[in-house]
Every structure is written in C-alpha cells, then in structure tokens.
C-alpha cells in the first residue's frame, strides 16, 4: 500500500523537524488574544511530549500489525460498503467538509470533498449512526475513537499539502470505493506515497505534511477515522486533558453546530419524502 520514495528518517530527531508544533502550517490569525497565545504555547509543549513518549514511535505511516484490531475493521468492510451505498443515494445532499468544519477552507473550498459523520470530536451523530449501524459497530473496536466519517473525494479532487493541527491523534483510512487506475489515486504522507485498497486499512500520522488526490474519473470513498495516539505517561495524561479542553474551542463548537443544522435538514427532507402521497 505504500511506496517509500526517500530514506526513512530516524524516529526522534527527524520527527521533531517534520511534525507540526503548535500552529506551524496553519493560517495565522490576526492579533490572537492572550488566551489563544497561551493555549498555542501549551499545544506546542504537549506535542513535544507526544513525540518523546510515543508508545510506538513516530513513523509517518504505521504497520497495521502495530494495531491488531485493524483486522476486525477490515473484516467488516462488506457491511460498511453496503451501508455506504445507501448513503450515496443522496450524495448530492451531503455536506462539503468545509461546510461543517470551516477551518478546512484553508485547503478546500469546492464541493468535491464531502462527508458523512458518525462521530466528530467525540460527539455522536445519532441519526447517521442509525442509518449505518454496522459501520458504527465496527468502529467501536477502535480504542479511544474521536472521529469517524465517510470521506468522499469526487473525480479530479486534489487536496494540497498540509499538516494537521496537533499530533495527539492518528488517522485511519479504510478503502471503500477505490477506482482504477491506482496510480492516479493516492495520498502522500511526508516522503511516502500510499495507495488505498478496497477493504484494507491505512494508518498514518497527519501531523506530517500530507496531500491526497483523485485524478480518476470516478468517486473515491474511504472510512476516515481519528483515534487517540498511544502514549506513555506523562504525555498520555496531558493529551487526554488537551483533548477534553479542545472540545470547548470555538472552531470545534462551530463545527458541531454546523453538523447539527445539516443533520436536521437532511432527515427532515427524508421524512417529507417518506410521507409524500404515493411514495
């Protein structure tokens, strides 16, 4: 699933150079408040702890054997794909990622990256879960789950190089719809080119620079999951505290509110269609 294009860095020093600290790689805010600057300093300090106390090191892309539960996720692929197919019947009504999480506008402003959240930042989407119970059952096998959604890349979509805002989580992709030809569809994480495969898991650290593209003429879909990075004490405790504090930040609260409004409209329209005479 991966092609190493350059020599691997050492685990510690190279990771410190390549990973995000604080707000590196994030569009700067105009005149950040004293509170914001204080929080950013804490995040930068926590990220250094996360690198030092990472339980399984800090590779850009992980060996799936590191996480034995990935086999259970892959076994659930046929049921997840069946539920996805039902969701895609209303693909045109699904929100673009930036409609939910407005900070995504720094890397995507079109309608070619759509989402269907089951859980975001630890908050469940009850109606979406009811629509995809087998998918929800599968992701419960992932320890310390934070986010799970269907990530839908339309033909021609290219997500530019960027870094995640914090290195306290890892990202999982399960290939659900992966069109051919494979060489026109990939994700680069640092210096590794990774190719999705249907029914196969890919785990990477989004704190490294990464970009993704779909240069085929068909839609690509993956199950997109964020889970807490396995850490040793004291980083594990600090990370837990920051994750809980982050829930109250304005951009996460805004995202949760945006999703709640979309969900309300989406299922109200579905109910109207069901109640239409002759439906």
What are these regions, as identified by a protein language model?
Residues 146, 157, 168-172, 208:
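Short beta-strand or tight-loop elements
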Residues 177-198:
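A short beta-strand-loop-beta hairpin characteristic of the jelly-roll/cupin
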């Amino acid at each position: 699933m991966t092609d190493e294009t350059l020599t691997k860095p050492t685990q510690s020093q190279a990771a410190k150079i390549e990973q995000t600290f604080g707000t590196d790689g994030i569009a700067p805010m105009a005149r950040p408040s004293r509170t914001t600057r204080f929080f950013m300093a804490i995040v930068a300090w926590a990220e250094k702890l996360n690198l030092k106390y990472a339980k399984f090191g800090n590779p850009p892309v992980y060996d799936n054997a590191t996480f034995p539960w990935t086999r259970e996720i892959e076994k659930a692929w046929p049921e997840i794909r069946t539920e996805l197919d039902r969701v895609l019947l209303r693909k045109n009504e699904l929100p673009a990622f930036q409609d939910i999480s407005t900070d995504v506008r720094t890397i995507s402003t079109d309608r070619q990256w759509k989402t269907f959240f089951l859980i975001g930042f630890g908050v469940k989407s009850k109606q979406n879960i009811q629509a995809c119970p087998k998918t929800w059952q599968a992701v419960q096998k992932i320890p310390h789950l934070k986010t799970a959604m269907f990530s839908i890349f339309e033909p021609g979509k290219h997500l530019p190089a960027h870094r995640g805002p914090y290195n306290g989580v890892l990202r999982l992709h399960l290939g659900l719809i992966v069109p051919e030809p494979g060489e026109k569809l990939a994700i680069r994480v640092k210096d590794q080119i990774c190719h999705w495969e249907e029914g196969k898991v890919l785990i990477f650290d989004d704190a490294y620079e990464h970009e993704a593209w779909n240069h085929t003429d068909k839609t690509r879909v993956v199950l997109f999951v964020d889970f807490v990075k396995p850490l040793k004490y004291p980083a594990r405790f600090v990370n837990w505290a920051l994750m809980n504090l982050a829930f109250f930040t304005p951009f996460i609260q805004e995202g949760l509110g945006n999703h709640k409004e979309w969900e309300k409209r989406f299922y109200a329209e579905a109910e109207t269609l069901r109640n239409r005479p002759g439906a």
